[in-house]
Amino acid sequence: MYLKNHTLGLRTKASQGAPLAKAAQSLLQLKKLDCVPPKYQTAYACEGKKLTIECEPGDLINLIRANYGRFSITICNDHGNVEWSVNCMFPKSLTVLNSKCSHKQSCSVLAATSMFGDPCPGTHKYLEAHYQCISAAQTSTTTNRPSPPPWVLSNGPPIFGNGSGLIQPTPQPPPRLPTLPGVVGIHGINGVPPTHATPSSSTAMLPGGRLKGVTSATTKHPGGRHDGLRPPPQLHHHHHHTDDTAPTKSSSGSAGNVTAPSNTRILTGVGGGGSDDGTLLTTKSSPNRTPGTAASAANNNSLGIGGTAPGSGGGVVRTINNINLNAAGMGAEDESKLFCGPTHARNLFWNMTRVGDVNVQPCPGGAAGIAKWRCVLMKRVPDAGYDEYDDEMPVASSTTPMPPPSSAGGDCLHNSSSCEPPVSMAHKVNQNQRLRNFEPTWHPLTPDLTQCRSLWLNSLEMRVNQQDSSLISIANDLSEVTSSKTLYGGDMLVTTKIIQRMSEKMLHDKGTFPDQRQREAIIMELLHGVVKTGSNLLDESQLSSWLDLNQEDQMRVATSLLTGLEYNAFLLADTIIRERNVVQKVKNILLSVRVLETKTIQGNVVFPDSDQWPLSSDRIELPRTALKENSEGGLVRIVFAAFDRLESILKPSYDHFDLKSARSYVRNTAILSNDSDTNAGEMQQRVRILNSKVISASLGKGRHIQLSQPIKLVLKHLKTENVSNPTCVFWNYIDHAWSANGCSLESTNRTHSVCSCNHLTNFAILMDVVDEHQHSLFTMFDGNMRIFIYISVAICVVFIIIALLTLKLFNGVFVKSARTSIYSSIYICLLAIELLFLLGIEQTETSIFCGFITVFLHCAILSGTAWFCYEAFHSYSTLTSDELLLEVDQTPKVNCYYLLSYGLSLSVVAISLGINPSTYTLRNDYCVLMEANALFYVTFVAPILIFFVAAISYTFLSWIIMRRKSRTALKTKEHTRLANVRFDIRCSFVFLLLLSADWCCAYFYLRGAKLDEDVAAIYGYCFVCFNTLMGLYIFVFHCIQNEKIRREYRKYVRQHAWLPKCLRCSKTSISSGIVSGNGGPGGVSGGVATNSAGTLSKSKSKLPLGSSDDGHDEEQPHQQQHQHDQPANEDAIIMGAGSDCELSEAQQRRTLKSGLLAGSLQPVTPVGAVVLERGTLRSTGMASVGHASPTSSAGSTHLIFAHKHQQQLQQQPGESYYHQPDYYSWKHPQAGGQREYYNNTGVPGGGGGVGVGGASPQQSHEVFYWTQKHNNQHGKKKRGGGAGAVPASPSGSLHSRVTPASQVLFYPSYKKTSGMKQPPPSAQQAYPHYAEALDPPNNAAYYQQQLQQQQQLRQQRQQQQQQQLSSDEEQAHLLHLQHQQRRAGGQQQLPAPPPHMAQYQQELLAQQQRQQYRNKHSNCDLSQGIGLGMNMGMGQGLGGDAYYNQGGGGSSNGGGVGGDGPVYEEILSNRNSDAQHYEVGDFDVDEVYNNSVGTGVFNSMRAAVAAGGSRYGGGSLSGGSVTSRNQQQQLQAKQKQPPRRCAADDDDDDDDDDDEYDDEVTAAEQLHDSVCDDEDNESDMDDDDTHGLPPQSDERMRRLMALQDEDFKRRFQRQQRKNGLPLDYGAPPQTSAGATIAHPIEHNGAVFGVSGGVGEGSMRGAYRQQQQQLNAKSPSARLAVNELFGHGNAGPPLPPANQTPAQKRQQLQKLSPQSTTSSSSHTSHSNLQQHSAPTHHHLQHQQPQLHHHQQQQQARNLSAMLDENNTVRCYLEPLAK
């Protein structure tokens, strides 16, 4: 085997006693044991195949060694590929195989990377196992592994002494050996063995390795090295010889000592000539021995075969192989058949030589000495067609030794029949087949010519020793011989010895020259000859001479050459007595002798000059201070030298092969086995090469002078590819090795390294050799880790893409804000990081994309971290500025974030590239991270830490500020926004921590994997977990957590047929569809279209209020005046089933136009149709009809819209609706115990009114009320608005000041509770139109007929719903939709009965008593009792379950459908998604009460009230408190009208004091009003600042309310003037409703109302004055904005809204001549007592001025307010008992 960093051998303990006695004792002990040698077998399996190991029954597998990789180029190499790595090893192969096969009879293991990993990508690997079958009984007692052979020396220093004596071999051929010679293994890599073995016999020289005798004694190594490097292997000296035998002992303590007699042959060899780096012990052979007496020291006679890695720096012999030929069935007969073929080498013919013998012959070319070459057995490349995988390889034994042979010859070795078990026939048959795996080979690559010396050099050596010889002549002759003659290994030793001898003799003779100049000239000439000789030895032509030497001799020759040059140079330096610089430059050496005067030294001394040595850019710099300290007599003498090709000689001790010989050796040899007992440190030993030229500097001859200041060296790398880890070293003359003591690496890059040393000598750079087959990061992962990383990255990428698509596709859901832009950028950066990481870990460092991936990944990580910092800063700035109440796209700030994030990141990366591009390209870590140098920490780690610390700091500050604000924040918009910001901060902080943990684990994993640390696996699995969690967190936090996005997901799934049906048929999805025109701004709604089933149609398009579609011209002739040139929405869906899937299956998807053409749709276009907008869902409703949330459950709050005349719809395209929450109604709920709730809401045309309900607990309920205002565009944009865009948070209102129309609808939250009981049929009744109900002859029959029809229709619909819907929630929702359908236009709505019909009063009272409240909280589903009667004129209304719960009461056209519907309670939760298109939380508290946009709109309501409730068709105030025109005029008469001007408070007053009614308003007045309107809108923006309001307090809201009341007065007057009303409140007493009917006045269609009625406006300003009069003693009592819509107690209910104005006026005149009036309660912020909600008796006392024909009416008030949970709260005033 050829295992990296593996050596075989155990410590040998030699005995100094009598060897024969110990041998005899060992023999006796071994005879007691079983003499049967163990059988070792080898099994192979190529990559992708299974390795099967099987033993005989009763035997178990005992694994010795195993490896998954490649150490041989021949195994599993059918095509002869020589480019594969043969230094491939998986360290845990034996561990993995033990877990599968140890102590089993048979096992099978797949040889694949999934099982063992991939140690060398690109190389076809194989699994090799060495094992033996042992009995089961032996396994129970034997725990130690088999011991190596006793002759293996694992920790011995050189076993040869210093000497040169040689013994010539005998002429007869070597005797035939019974077995192959054993191999003594020495650590050729891993340091100095602790013991020395001294050879004891003659030495025969072999090419590349010496055959030497092994001594019988061993000595302790004198001590360890202290050079800072691993000690080199001690090589074998060959100078002292003894004839003692060396008994050896197994280190494992096996029984007996094995003695090697004098005639034992032990094969040893030292790689010679620089080409053989294997350390092989030489063979000791007795020249006169005979085959009969020859014996082996051990049964494991093995071959020691060195090998190298194919790296360019040369390979390293890692192991010494032991082949047990006996176990393989190869005996003496087999060995005799193996010979090395004849060949030519070094001008010699080497004849056929038997394996194990050494061929010795005289040196070539007349040189003195002998040449040697050895024949060994090595594995060969298989022949074509020969399948070597089916054969077993001879197994190497490293355990139990055989007993030594006895003198009698009766030992087991020779008498194999007495000891060896009988060999099976099959085994003998396969012997020849096994032998085919091996072939004899000459080792080493070149013969050993160490003892060969040329005659010329012998002559020069004799001359230099003579006394009168001329040194100059000898030096010249030496240089001539070395340059022109062929030298051998022995010549190299002689040459360096002559150089040293000349320097010693010149030192003695220089005193004989009295003249200084002559002395300098002679020494200079001598030095020139020496330099030329040294250059000749280093020349390439003499490379073969160096290869003739073994590694040790090479080092000794090189050291001798360096010291000889230095000694001769200092001879000249010491001779010079003045400042001088002598330069000797030859081909391979540059020598400079400098003598400097200390006083002239101005700076540091640098060598060499740029023009002196063009071969290299190396430079050495000596500090000035250090030179002066080492001066002598005012002179400093320095010797500099630079060498070329010396680096190929002075190789590190770990690398004994040069590149050429290493590759050749690997191709021709194969390691047959390896020792698996080597420790992990040896296995992980690095391969190092000398990667720079050698440069030297000296201040004293041969002295290692310590300097006070270190010198600086700049050394150029010879090899820049596949090398790493530079180390500054110097050549230690004593150890003949490189040492790092006193030197340090200051900096390095791809081409150069800068070193610093505190002494002077010869310097160079050592570097690690990286395998030429580059490994990507994934090659270091095991199979499981690789799969996990793929899965983790894939999950994270998918979720990031989903989040990005959600932000893009559902952008209508999100309010475009800075936070949205920040998170979009974060997702983009994270996506880039994940993808680049996945690409980078698959690349190799030599890939062209490696540098680009690292650069972009650096930039992406910096940008992503910066965006997290900006997100934390944005949260902080939101809390510390006015942005808390806004959610808009702050474009300048976001642009600044973009600039800082990407700009800074790109700048940092550009600077890093400019400083050191190789950091990203050639020296990075697996194409993912930069090289871990100073630049990495400055440009990568430091910015990330800065951004991270800043993000944490801002998050901490934000949390502190938020805690403070939460204690003082108002329970409105600010509180809601604080809750949102708190949630965002928490989630962002968790996100930041999760991302930081993910990246940190990835970083530590990459670093640990590179260094093969065990903890790297832990970091790897943590990275997988955190990366997966990060992807899930992004999806949950930014997608699933948002309710609006969940709804959009459901809607998206429903609308795409390509998705699976299981998703589209989800019952949790929204069951809705909208049919409407696809009109643009200014378009007209197509109206409400119903099919035969009566389902409500809905539209997906955004339509403005009061718009219609010209696509319905033919089908809707009555809408001709509302046409718009936009086509109808062909994709609109008519819902006829319970869900979209059912609808699709029933083939009921039809467009509006197709339905109209088919005649199955009956379009109903109510006058003043409006579109309620919720996201992309709109519902088209008629005026006076309540609309529920398209997506919420049944029973949502309804909005009532007053109709407008048709001609006004086109004139007012910019109308919008405003929500005015009240502070006091929410802050101070009305106190009291049990109160009865009644609904006095009348819905003309909406299905009747709601009567008095049963007793119920006091409770506030949700309701919405809205205002309307013109969009008078004056060119100046308001805050929060943009051209053509709907602002996210406009100041003071919820409309866009720029767009023609925008509608906002809010829906509360509900939870489902138990349903109501079905009321008796008697309570469910409908009421006819006024014309039929007032006709006494027909009314009874008509009511009975209508009641029966409604009951049948209700039963049919209930059956249909039960079949279609599977959940109570959807059933209730569809019931509500059907209820709206009937009220909206399914058929003509029935009005409430006249108040004088006693029979209906009794029925309503009976139903009220039967129904009771079942829930503490009820929603504001005020439409459920609509169809139960319009009885507000009688002071009665239907309440209870029929009022508040779905399907709870009887119905007519507009009544509740069904009595089993569930009840939905209010959920006080943070429902950010309940507001759409704007969020409820977007109300600015300051601006809602200050800005004129949100307050001036009430003026139109006052105008409408002043004109009379019947002025409009359906002009009653449903659900609110309305005063008659007489009452209003009486109150207005008491007010003083200030002059009309545009002042802060008085700009709305008119200077016209006429009390007469004015039908028209001049154009100048209208223009003046418009200008004043705009000025008010702008001036009121800063009301908070001008009035000095505190930022957050209850007092702040009270003061805002006071300012609001003042604003009401002036805007009310202006609105009257715009609508043609008198400018004061003092109307004549004789003014009545009839006058209003006679003079209809166009207006803006004030939008107020609750529960199916028509609201006309808030009487806040008027009521405030009225209440001040009634409560003169209580000036603090005031009327809040929530006091709305109390029905008057005079006059009957008004006609339906869908009747013509003439019909309504006629019916009103028939019913009552009185106008509608009402009283209202007021709310005080201190006690909130009820002042005007009395019973009908109290009303008569409190309002005696009312007409005596008026019916007693109980008034109720409804109000709405935003609570702290972002929910619109309703407050329904109870009737006093």
From Swiss-Prot:
Belongs to the G-protein coupled receptor 2 family. LN-TM7 subfamily. The record marks L760, T761 as: Cleavage. This is Latrophilin Cirl. Keywords: Cell membrane, Disulfide bond, G-protein coupled receptor, Glycoprotein, Lectin, Membrane, Phosphoprotein, Receptor, Transducer, Transmembrane, Transmembrane helix. SUPFAM superfamilies: Family A G protein-coupled receptor-like. It holds the Pfam family GAIN. Residues 189-304, 1096-1127, 1235-1257, 1270-1300, 1344-1369, 1511-1596, 1684-1756 are annotated as: Disordered. The chain crosses the membrane at residues 787-807, 821-841, 848-868, 895-915, 941-961, 989-1009, 1017-1037. Residues 247-266, 284-303 have a biased composition (Polar residues). GO terms for cellular component: plasma membrane. The modification Phosphoserine is found at S1189, S1289, S1296, S1366, S1367. Proteolytically cleaved into 2 subunits, an extracellular subunit and a seven-transmembrane subunit. PROSITE patterns: G_PROTEIN_RECEP_F2_4, GAIN_B, SUEL_LECTIN. Residues 1096-1108, 1344-1365, 1527-1536, 1706-1732 have a biased composition (Low complexity). Residues 1545-1562, 1572-1585 have a biased composition (Acidic residues). InterPro entries: GAIN_B, GAIN_dom_N, GAIN_dom_sf, GPCR_2-like_7TM, GPCR_2_extracell_dom_sf, GPCR_2_secretin-like, GPS, Lectin_gal-bd_dom. Glycans are attached at N5, N162, N257, N300, N351, N415, N674, N722, N749. It comes from the Eukaryota. Residues 1-786, 842-847, 916-940, 1010-1016 are extracellular. Residues 580-773 form the GAIN-B domain. Disulfide bonds join C728-C755, C743-C757. The lineage of its organism: Eukaryota, Metazoa, Ecdysozoa, Arthropoda, Hexapoda. One of its GO terms (biological process) is adult locomotory behavior. Residues 1243-1254 have a biased composition (Gly residues). It is a multi-pass membrane protein. Forms a heterodimer, consisting of a large extracellular region non-covalently linked to a seven-transmembrane moiety.
